[in-house]
Design a protein with these regions (language model features):
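Short, Lys/Arg- and Gly-enriched loop/turn segments at beta-strand edges
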Residues: 248-255
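Non-catalytic DNA-recognition/assembly elements of restriction-modification systems
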Residues: 1-15, 19-31, 118-132, 143-188, ...
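A short glycine-rich beta-alpha junction/loop motif
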Residues: 2, 68-75, 105-125, 244, ...
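Sequence-specific dsDNA recognition surfaces
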Residues: 5-46, 62-65, 69-71, 179-192, ...
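Short, solvent-exposed loop/turn positions at domain surfaces
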Residues: 103, 142, 189-190, 229, ...
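Glycine- and charge-enriched low-complexity intrinsically disordered segments
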Residues: 278-290, 295-298
Length: 360
């Protein structure tokens, strides 16, 4: 075994993003979120690895090109002679450098701490082979994600084709407030629920994605706590969930046979029978409704969308038979997405397995 510090060195940047305004050029400069702009100078002649050392995203690893730079919140990591920069980037990604952060207000990591990370010693040919194998997996993962995104775009296009743009409403559908076409608009439990290690799902806003519920990082309650919260609301299949605190406006339909409760960062809408839940889900995620949601949000330290504002959201109401036809189309697309997602999940498992094998 060797240590990370045996195969690379650090270098620093003193560039502030605010100083880049009048530096237009052809050389890329990067920050924690990626490319900032192209400027008329560069700091690194050769490809290198960069690590977010301060602030949001601390520990994130990027492989960046020759003749480029990073701003001062990033750390240059320069491979030694005989070390593949591509291999170095994968090795550092596997190390999960965020675990070294210090500082409560602004997290920070130091090279002097993470340079002691252990890894297997590989010669340059082995490094190239490892990077090549991982590249193939990453390319396949990227392709699967693109396939999923294209299927979502296909559904969006079908929605507009069948119902028209929600803003222009070319077919002249009736426009109604949500409170007029629903039997229930509420939110989750306001009193902090008593959580347990396992049991019944307790969802919060982070678990509500667009068109899906994510339970990789979820809390649990027991049956007693569920029964207490259920006196207020019992979620049902076909209800619509909306994230209403922080990152607001994400929306999905409650699936069949899914028992859960929720905290107040989720809103629930139960539409009348004239509204197909799948149609409602895609209406709410349309650009028009997302604009309405942002305009309706209250701003404090984080955005919030309250029940009263949700009731006043407006959308068109096409004939139910047309909504049902759209829902049938979505079901077919979801079958394709499931197959692709299963392949994507397998590729992610393979990638993690190879990373563990190569880097320990």
């Amino acid at each position: 075994m060797i240590q990370l510090g045996d195969i690379c060195t650090k270098a620093s940047s003193n560039i502030a993003q605010k100083d880049l305004q009048n530096c237009d050029g052809v050389y890329p400069i990067y920050g924690a979120s990626g490319l900032i702009k192209h400027v008329n100078f560069y700091q690194q002649e050769n490809p290198y690895v960069a690590v977010v050392k301060d602030g949001a995203g601390v520990g994130r690893v990027m492989q960046l090109p020759a003749k480029s730079s990073v701003i001062g919140t990033m750390q240059y990591i320069l491979p030694n002679i005989g070390v593949s920069v591509h291999y170095l980037a994968y090795a550092m990604e596997h190390m999960n450098l965020a675990k070294y952060y210090t500082g409560a207000t602004i997290p920070h990591i130091y090279f002097k701490d993470y340079c002691k990370e252990n890894l297997h010693a590989h010669n340059i040919d082995e490094q190239y082979h490892i990077a090549h194998m991982l590249d193939k997996i990453v390319d396949l993962i990227s392709h699967r994600k693109q396939q999923l995104a294209k299927l979502d775009e296909l559904v969006k296009a079908r929605f507009v084709e069948m119902f028209g743009d929600p803003v222009r409403n070319p077919y002249g559908w009736e426009i109604r407030h949500f409170e007029e076409i629903s039997t229930l608009i509420t939110d989750g439990e306001h009193v902090t629920p008593r959580r347990v290690e396992s049991g019944i799902y307790l969802l919060s806003a982070r678990n509500v994605l667009n068109h899906a519920i994510q339970v990789d990082d979820v809390d649990y309650i027991d049956q007693t706590e569920y029964a207490r919260i259920a006196k207020r609301v019992v979620p049902q299949a076909g209800d619509i969930l909306i994230s209403c605190s922080g990152s607001i406006g994400r929306c999905c339909v409650v699936p069949d046979n899914f028992k859960f409760q929720m905290v107040r960062s989720i809103a629930l809408i139960r539409f009348r029978k004239q509204i197909n839940p799948v149609f409602a889900e895609w209406l709410i995620t349309s650009d028009d409704l997302q604009r309405q949601i942002l305009q309706a949000a209250t701003q404090s330290s984080q955005a919030n969308l309250f029940q009263g504002r949700i009731k006043k959201l407006r959308g068109y109401v096409p004939p139910l038979k047309l909504q049902d036809r759209f829902a049938d189309f979505v079901v077919k697309i979801n079958r394709q997405k499931l197959t692709i997602q299963q392949s994507l999940d397998q590729l992610e498992v393979l990638r993690k397995s190879l990373m563990q094998e190569y880097f320990g």
